[in-house]
Amino acid sequence: MNFEYNEKTQALLEKLKAFMNEEVYPIEKEYIHAVENGSANNGEGRWKTPEMMHTLKKRAKEAGLWNLFLPEEYKPYGAGLTNAEYAPLCEEMGRVLFSSEIFNCSAPDTGNMEVLAKYGNESQKKQWLEPLLNGEIRSAFAMTEPAVASSDATNIETSIKRDGDEYVINGRKWYTSGAMNENCKIMVVMGKTDFDAPRHQQQSQIL
């Protein structure tokens, strides 16, 4: 079997490595220090994104290293890479704790954008997906609950019930990824809409 990267992946990987060497590694300690300082003083600046992140995002977008995670089926969104093509880029980004955010490839935004790209209607895509793809907003994902082993999502107990033109969400979540980000504007919440359905068909997600 041939395990070499194809030309597209190799070109992106070389560009990514150059960006990491020129832009990310030199400021790694400074960025972490800025985050730690923000968490001091009773945590008042804990969730404030350091200004250098915004600068790096702009440079990554200009370099064509943006939204690398969405596969071919979601074009024109993303780079149209397969998982095998995206994997070595993840490996490179993973060398620095915060670098995936620079390229708009960090959770929970990646998963939420994929959900919106696949299942969202045109109104939802315009309101939420496009600003996420542009890096204008951040998002959150709420699945984990304190009373159950939530890594198995069939255990979750939060209910989502239709009430006229609205939905009522009743439950308790914690470890909600992205919820405290200062730019979080949309949350994807997992709950159960049919407790009597087969075990793996009870759940829904709501914006």
Q: What are the residue ranges of the model-derived segments?
A:
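A short, Trp-centered hydrophobic/proline-enriched beta-strand micro-motif
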Residues: G135-T144
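A structural signal for short hydrophobic beta-strand segments in well-ordered beta-sheet cores
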Residues: T158-K161
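N-terminal glycine-rich flavin-associated loop
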Residues: F103-S123, D152
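Short, solvent-exposed loop/turn elements at beta->coil junctions and helix N-caps
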Residues: K75, T144-V148, Y175-S177
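Active-site-adjacent elements of ketosynthase-type condensing enzymes
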Residues: V148-I156
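Amphipathic, small/basic residue-rich leader segments at the start of a protein or domain
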Residues: M1-A107, S123-Q127, P131
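Short loop segments at secondary-structure junctions
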Residues: M93, K118-N121, D163-D165, K192-D196
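A short core secondary-structure module
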Residues: E166, N170-L207
